[in-house]
Amino acid sequence: MADWELRAASMADLEEIVEIRAVVMRADLERLGRYDEHRVRQRLRDAYQPEHTSAIEVAGALVGCVALRPADDAYWLEHFLLVPELQGKGIGSAVLGRLLERPDREGALTRLNVLRGSAARRLYERHGFVLESEDAVDVYMVRNPTSRTPAPLASTNRVPTNRTPAPRTP
């Protein structure tokens, strides 16, 4: 079991998150022939908005982040990153469930894009996201606030061991 916390992200977190992103996205970007060591980092630096971003911490250490950015017709789920050694342990699902409470309360759509072939797509589908469109690199998904199948969450944070697409950030 791992204890996790969400906290407001800050500019001081940026470079650590940039490095997490480079590790997390490398395999998918290489598979798509799009990995560039500088670009994978710079795209996050250019798009980072700490006011919409939560840092994910386990045992006081920064292990990822997620952003929920309001737009004209929906929220955009962006920059959902979790260090590889903690993936598949329920933390991502619990964090996503917590984050989606806001659009659910507000009756708002949530949109995201994920790289084609990414294992993360299954996580999003389990939380009610469905295909909206796709291109050669990205899959665009949308979630109606009533379509969510809730992930089991403990009362503590304990979990088992406008329609214009958001700017791409590979």
Q: How would you describe each model-predicted region?
A:
Residues 61-69, 76-81:
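Conserved beta-strand in the GNAT
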Residues 45-55, 64:
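A short helix-loop-beta-strand connector motif used in the catalytic cores of GNAT acetyltransferases and
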Residues 82, 88-101, 121-126:
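Conserved acetyl-CoA-binding loop-helix of GNAT-fold acetyltransferases
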Residues 4-19:
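A short beta-loop-alpha structural element at the N-terminal edge
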Residues 74, 103-115:
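Conserved GNAT acetyl-CoA-binding A-motif
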Residues 22-43:
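Conserved GNAT-fold acetyl-CoA-binding loop/helix
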